């Protein structure tokens, strides 16, 4: 099946500041704003996005554990108090705007200048701090919870301890 999605998940997202519930994806050389259902539909067309599709599932937007529906996967897009995407060069701390990344399969989308470090917490207030390296294209951190262990998946990071993986290592092909 032919898909208009880019081959690399690293090139999938652009960011939109309208209404706090919009993600943009690269389609036909433009970056139109789409809602989660449209994103889901596009992912269904992508025969190389099996793992990514399963993690995203039908999506909703939530700012923390308490307002997320645990039966539905969450896309969390960080924003500042003026509803703009953050441009961060330092550490993100919980209770700032990443108060909780706790939903299995959660997708955490970073803006362009990715942070040096992010901290996330689960519903038991257990924290994980993880370093992120990225080029100036934005980045994504995919969060899963497995037996109380965090699995963070981000592009452009080499790691051998089983916690951080390269994108290519988690791609699933039909």
Curated annotation (Swiss-Prot):
Coiled coil: none
Top-level taxonomic group: Viruses
Domain FAS1: 36-171
SUPFAM superfamilies (alphabetical): FAS1 domain (SSF82153)
The protein's name in its UniProt record: Putative FAS1 domain-containing protein 096L
